[in-house]
Amino acid sequence: MTELQELRRYRRDLHRIPELDFDLPQTIAYIEGVLAPLACEVTHPCPSCVCAFFDAGVGATHATAIRADMDALPIAEATGVAFASTHPGKMHACGHDGHMAMALAAATFVDRAIREQPGTIKRNVLFVFQPAEETTGGAKTVCESGVFERYGADRIFGFHVWPDLPAGTLASCPGPLLARSSETHIHIHGTSIHIAKTYGVPVEESHDAALAAAKFLVSERELMDVLGADEPCIGKFGLLQAGTVCNAVAGEAHVAGSLRVFTDDMFDRAREGVRRVLDEACAATGCTYDLDFAEGYPPVDNDPELFAHIAPALSELQVVDEPLLIAEDFAFYQRYLPGVFFLLGTGAPAGQDNPSDSDGCPAYATSALHTDTMLFDEEILLKGLDVYKRLLLLG
C-alpha cells in the first residue's frame, strides 16, 4: 500500500464516523486499531485522549510530540461523496479527519524507521490524539494530565488544513500565528411593560433592554475601530435576542459574541472597554446587566527558537506576514512546551481545474471550514506527512 493509499484509507474511514466533543468511542477504537500492531506504548492520560509513545531505541531522553484533534462538528453533511458521514447531523467539516490521517501515517513511518533503520529517528516520539478542540479546549486537559512530563516531550508540532491557501502550501511564522479568543455573553435586564405606557417616559427611565442592547452594539463597534488602530483586535456579536412580543418593551436581552486579540494587554484593554460601553448603555436606559467573559483559548504563539531550528529543513515554508484572527486550542500546548503550528493549503490554485475522483471528492477544497460541503483530496496530506517526517528526523 502506498502512502497516498494509506492516507486516503485513514481519512475516509474517519470521515464516515464523525463524533463530537469528548464522546468519541468509534474514533478512539479506530485509532487504537491502527496503533495496535505498531511497537508503541498506547495510553489514555485523560478522558477520550489516545497517546502513542515510540522509544527511538537510541537512549534518547527527550521526545517530539505530534498532535492531532479528533472531534467533528454538529453539521449535517451535504457533500454527496461515497464516504460521507454515516452519523446524521455530524461531519468532519474542519479537517480533523485529515489531521488524524497524517498523524497515523507518521506513526507507521516512525515504527518502520525504528525497526528497519535504527538510529534514523534520533528522538523519542509521542503522538497525541486529543478530544474537544471545537468546544472546551481538550488540549488543556491533555496538558494537565502530565503526559508530556512522563515521556520527556520538549517540543510539539501540529497542522491545520487551510482552504484559503493554494493546495500544498506550507505556511507558518515565528511568534503569534493565531488569535486569543474569548466568548462573551451579556444578559441585560429591564422591565417589560406595554408600549402604550411608554409615551413621554424619558429614555433613561425606559428600562428597555432592547434599546440598551442596541446602544451597546453601536458603541462597541466604535470601540473596536479605535482599539484596532493600534493592533489587530476584533469584537463581534453575532447573537442578539430581546423581548417576547412586538408591542411590549423588552424586559430581557441576550447579546453574545467573540473577542479576538493577540496580546494579553490588548485583551485587557478590550474587556475594560466592553464593560465601559456596556455600563454607559445600561445607565442611559435604566437597565442592569450580567457580563461573562470566558477565558477562551490563548494565542497560538510559535516558539521563535524552535522555528529557527526547523526552518532549514523546510525550505518551502512560507512565512505568514500577519497573524490570523482565528483561534485554536493548540495554544494550550505552547504554554507547556515549545511548539510550532502549521497551516496546510487545500485550496485550488488560481485558474486550476478541480476534477473529482470516482467517489466524488474534489482535488481541492471548494468550501470554507465549518461548512456542510467542505472537502479536500488526500494527495494534499502527503505534504503534511512529508513535513512530519522531516521534523521527526531532526535532532
Locate predicted features.
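Acidic/His- and Gly-rich active-site-bordering loop/insert found
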Residues: 1-92, 101, 108, 112-123
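Histidine-centered active-site/metal-ligand motif
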Residues: 15-17, 92, 96-99, 160, ...
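Histidine/acidic-residue-rich, glycine-tolerant segments that coordinate divalent metal ions
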Residues: 53, 73, 81-91, 98, ...
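Solvent-exposed residues in well-ordered beta-strands and their adjoining turns
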Residues: 55, 69-71, 130, 187-191, ...
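Short, flexible, mixed-charge acidic loops at enzyme active sites
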Residues: 75-83, 175-180, 352-367
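Short pre-catalytic strand/loop immediately N-terminal to key active-site residues, enriched for Gly-Thr
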Residues: 85-94, 371-379
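Metal-dependent amide/peptide-bond hydrolase catalytic core
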Residues: 195-196, 200-203, 210-395
